[in-house]
Amino acid sequence: MNIFKQTDSLSLMKGMEKETVDLVLTDPPYIISKPSGFKSVVNGEKRFAVSTEHGEWDKPENFSLEDLGESVNEYYRVLKKHGTAIVFCDLWKISKVKRLMEKAGFKQIRMIEWIKTNPVPLNSKRNYLSNAREIALLGVKVSKPTFNSSYDNGIYQFPICHEKGRFHPTQKPYPLMWALIEKHSNAGDVVLDTFAGAATTLIAAKNLQRKYIGCELDKEYYDKAEERLK
């Protein structure tokens, strides 16, 4: 049972039976898109800022925290007891996403941190720190989740995806998703990603002998992701 559809998160899950998934691992829109690049600033000096213009799918008129909350509720419904959900989110929305997960019923909420070993510098005196990390929140349905490790500090260090093989602006590195799936599920388990993007989660699940269910709404990304899954 490997399923990949071109549809939205809620439409996919509304057709799923409850308690049929072992692990949710997903990277929804951060809702941070805005124009950037070379701009005139103080005293006419031009400075460069890394683009956060990811696309229409990442804008508040097309996706909101309320929309994410509906998906989180469905994650809880389709997860088996003792299942785990890992949801990537914007650094500045951690507390809001945590509340969404708590409201849905998730317990043992923890933070996972991806440290980028080759971050893109921001090159700005006003915002001088590099974009060197991203955050995911982990929640458990009921208790006693699958955890294939004796210890984990929740910090993962991997480089960002190189241009070769990268076509999605927020594409996560394969080794990161592989590590998360390996630790939080077992062979034969079902992994769900309802914001599949480049389908990296689904590919890692397949290679780890897990089953996968996923979807991607954007037609261009869906077609490219489907090719990667072949």
Show the residue positions of the predicted features.
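Conserved SAM-binding loop
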Residues: A225-E226
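Core catalytic lobe of class I
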Residues: M1-G214, D218-Y222
